[in-house]
Amino acid sequence: MGTNQILDEIREVNLSYLLLAQQMLREDRVAAMYRLGIDEDIADILIKLTNSQLLKMAGSNMLLCRFRFDDSLIAEILTSHKQDRALTQSHAAILMAGQPAEKIS
């Protein structure tokens, strides 16, 4: 995979992420903020973006989304194949809820 193809893929992921984030925020702001790991300031910015601004942001050569965990325990919980998937997901959600919301510095 060449550099240009990777950059195209990053732009596509960025646009999909931004569109999904806006949709989630419009439908249930509080749940979206929790699921996206963002604070109210970021939510306000995202919800107000025009289509032109979305495309401009998506055109960045860096990913706008990232993994919300740096803890290997959360990664192990999310990838485990235990029988009680709902309990496993709840456990991961509890651990991730303790992670701070992202801030723009």
From Swiss-Prot:
Compartment(s) of residence: Cytoplasm
GO biological process: bacterial-type flagellum assembly; positive regulation of DNA-templated transcription; regulation of bacterial-type flagellum assembly
Gene Ontology molecular function terms on file: DNA binding
Gene Ontology cellular component annotations, sorted alphabetically: cytoplasm
Keyword line: Activator, Bacterial flagellum biogenesis, Cytoplasm, Disulfide bond, DNA-binding, Transcription, Transcription regulation
Superkingdom per UniProt: Bacteria
Assembly: Homodimer; disulfide-linked. Forms a heterohexamer composed of two FlhC and four FlhD subunits. Each FlhC binds a FlhD dimer, forming a heterotrimer, and a hexamer assembles by dimerization of two heterotrimers.
Family, similarity comment: Belongs to the FlhD family.
Domain notes from UniProt: The C-terminal region contains a putative helix-turn-helix (HTH) motif, suggesting that this region may bind DNA.
Function: Functions in complex with FlhC as a master transcriptional regulator that regulates transcription of several flagellar and non-flagellar operons by binding to their promoter region. Activates expression of class 2 flagellar genes, including fliA, which is a flagellum-specific sigma factor that turns on the class 3 genes. Also regulates genes whose products function in a variety of physiological pathways.
Name used for this protein in its record: Flagellar transcriptional regulator FlhD
Gene responsible for this protein: flhD
